[in-house]
């Protein structure tokens, strides 16, 4: 075990017979008018084209497609960043990474997380009297006060980071494949640096590790059951509730086994997409059964598909980033091309959100924070600025106006982490830095700086294939506008009360339920 014996923090295991032993469902304080329950479901690495309602070629999302027909579908909805931790931090704070401090992903050994002076959506609603729960992927810090149990969630059940950041006994399908957890104390290591073999993937309930390694093949159903049970209990408490579900899907490894289990077959991805769709359907069915008239269900993706996983990655739909593919590399996850941050998104609230509506409003994950806070009758945290806006008028079909301007930060493909290198202005998009992420063929597009930005008209060129001619009147009219809005936001960020995340690493903070077992192995009942 080496350093595990000496350095890994021992996390005690407590197996409770009660599902929510630490959640207080009782009513306290004065009685208020009914406030909506909130269910946020965030898919992982799901492409815009993975939603059947978006892309006719997709036939595997019957529950989500039904939700789209019964609610609102957003076709110009964007992640706040193109990778996991920054996107999730922005969802929970309404602020870009340059403000909240989270500009790239946290590691298994990360000491820090989302800065503690940043206020999360769960903390705001908890203070407003909501009972709160998070189920699934967190990826905003797991050590000490960065754990979700200390960030506003009364209950937590899930994996603290991505489900490929630890070995398992049933490793599922990955590209390249990763081995199962070692069963002996040998020093063998997989030569692929993307595979984890030292420490098994942990499953938490509140502050306790309840399974390590987690059984990925049963994880989706566990998440569904915990979500359904929380909704059932919370709906009878007399208090409004917030449920945030961070899905393990569609991130590799894919754990389902379709009839023809060829690791290179798109059938694997489709089977996993169907499993995710079923999970979402179970949550929606429970909402419909116990809290239909007073619950907003908001579904979205955290970023685009992970193209380097080849056939185990999703579909960008028409947003193929052709200019970048001609330069090399992928225009999907980690990049500021549309395929990296334009994500599927749906809102469902019978009687409030109109039925079978497609919204073209320019929206972002950043907007969930201020919108939900407004619906809950709470107040935004003071002494800081927000990049998201209250879009409840859009949700209720009273407006098609969202943002006029969005900024897309570097998420690992080119440039400095978090830097605002791309500007969306109405139907136009300007790139000051371009670069491709690692593609299926292993290629990475070169980092290129554009003093005069590349500007694309997305209305005419969704594939981002041909930028405007720099000498054209259209380009010359746009250039000063783009330059000005970028300068304005950078000055606004400089004047803001911004945070800085701690990205230092220490092996001793690695989640481990039993450092005396190879890979920290322990199972329920041991």
From Swiss-Prot:
Please give the Gene3D superfamilies that the UniProt record associates with this protein.
3.30.1120.10, Alkaline Phosphatase, subunit A (3.40.720.10)
Q: Which residues form the signal peptide?
A: 1-16
Q: Where does substrate bind?
A: 137, 162, 251
Q: Which Pfam families match?
A: Sulfatase, Sulfatase_C
The record's subcellular locations are:
Lysosome
- Reaction(s) this enzyme catalyzes, per UniProt: an aryl sulfate + H2O = a phenol + sulfate + H(+); Hydrolysis of the 3-sulfate groups of the N-sulfo-D-glucosamine 3-O-sulfate units of heparin
Q: Which UniProt keywords apply?
A: Calcium, Disulfide bond, Glycoprotein, Hydrolase, Lysosome, Metal-binding, Signal
**Gene Ontology terms describing biological process:** gene expression; glial cell differentiation; homeostasis of number of cells; lysosome organization; neuron apoptotic process; retina development in camera-type eye; sulfur compound metabolic process
Cofactor(s) it depends on: Ca(2+)
InterPro entries, alphabetically? Answer: Alkaline_phosphatase_core_sf, Sulfatase, Sulfatase_CS, Sulfatase_N
The answer, when asked if Signal is one of the entry's keywords, is yes
The EC number(s) attached to this protein equal 3.1.6.1, 3.1.6.15
Q: Which residues carry this modification: 3-oxoalanine (Cys)?
A: 84
Q: List the record's Gene Ontology CC terms alphabetically.
A: endoplasmic reticulum; extracellular space; lysosome
UniProt-annotated catalytic positions = 84, 139
Which residues are tagged as glycosylated in the record?
117, 215, 356, 497
Q: Does the keyword Endoplasmic reticulum apply?
A: no
The entry's family comment says: Belongs to the sulfatase family.
Q: What is this protein called?
A: Arylsulfatase G
Species, as recorded: Rattus norvegicus (Rat)
């Amino acid at each position: 075990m080496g350093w595990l014996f000496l350095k890994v923090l021992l996390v005690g295991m407590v197996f409770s017979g009660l599902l929510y032993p630490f959640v207080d469902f009782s009513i306290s304080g004065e009685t208020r008018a009914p406030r909506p329950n909130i269910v946020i479901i965030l898919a992982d690495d799901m492409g815009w084209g993975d939603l059947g309602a978006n892309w006719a070629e997709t036939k595997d999302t019957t529950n989500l497609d039904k939700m789209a027909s019964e609610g609102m579908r957003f076709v110009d909805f964007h992640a706040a960043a193109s990778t996991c931790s920054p996107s999730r931090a922005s969802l929970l704070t309404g602020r870009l990474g340059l403000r909240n401090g989270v500009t790239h992903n946290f590691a298994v050994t990360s000491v820090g997380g989302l800065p503690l002076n940043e206020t999360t959506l769960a903390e705001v609603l908890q203070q407003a009297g909501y009972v709160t729960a998070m189920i699934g992927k967190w990826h905003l810090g797991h050590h000490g006060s960065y754990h979700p149990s200390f960030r506003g969630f009364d209950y937590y059940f899930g994996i603290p980071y991505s489900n490929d950041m630890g070995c398992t006994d049933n490793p599922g399908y990955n590209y390249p494949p990763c081995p199962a957890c070692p069963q002996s104390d040998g020093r063998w290591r997989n030569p692929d640096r993307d595979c984890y073999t030292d420490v098994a993937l942990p499953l938490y309930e509140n502050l306790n590790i309840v399974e390590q390694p987690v059984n990925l093949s049963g994880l989706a159903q566990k998440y569904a059951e915990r979500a359904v049970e929380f909704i059932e209990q919370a709906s009878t408490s007399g208090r409004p509730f917030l449920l945030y579900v961070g899905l393990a899907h569609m991130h590799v490894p894919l754990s389902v086994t379709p009839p023809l289990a060829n690791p290179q077959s798109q059938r694997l991805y489709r089977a996993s997409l169907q499993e995710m769709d079923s999970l979402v359907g179970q949550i929606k069915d429970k909402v419909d059964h116990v809290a239909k008239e007073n619950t907003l269900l908001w579904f979205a993706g955290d970023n685009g598909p992970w193209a380097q996983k080849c056939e185990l990655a999703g579909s960008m739909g028409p947003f193929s980033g052709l200019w970048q593919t001609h330069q090399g590399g992928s225009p999907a996850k980690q990049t500021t091309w549309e395929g990296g941050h334009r994500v599927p998104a749906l809102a469902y609230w019978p009687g409030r959100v109109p039925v079978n509506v497609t919204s073209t409003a320019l929206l972002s994950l950043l907007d969930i924070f201020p919108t939900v806070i407004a619906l809950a009758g709470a107040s935004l945290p003071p002494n800081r600025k927000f990049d998201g806006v209250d879009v409840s008028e859009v949700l209720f079909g009273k407006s098609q106006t969202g943002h006029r301007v969005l900024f897309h930060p570097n998420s690992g493909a080119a440039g400095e982490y978090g830097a605002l290198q791309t500007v969306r202005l109405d139907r136009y998009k300007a790139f000051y830095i371009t670069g491709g992420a690692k593609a299926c063929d292993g290629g990475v597009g070169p980092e290129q700086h554009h003093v005069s930005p590349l500007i694309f008209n997305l209305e005419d060129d969704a594939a981002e294939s041909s930028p405007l001619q720099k000498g054209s009147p259209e380009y010359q009219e746009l250039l000063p506008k783009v330059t000005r809005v970028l300068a304005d936001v950078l000055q606004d960020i400089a004047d803001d009360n911004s945070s800085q995340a701690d990205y230092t690493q220490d092996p001793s903070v690695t989640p481990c339920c039993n450092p005396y077992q190879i890979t920290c192995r322990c199972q329920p009942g041991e």
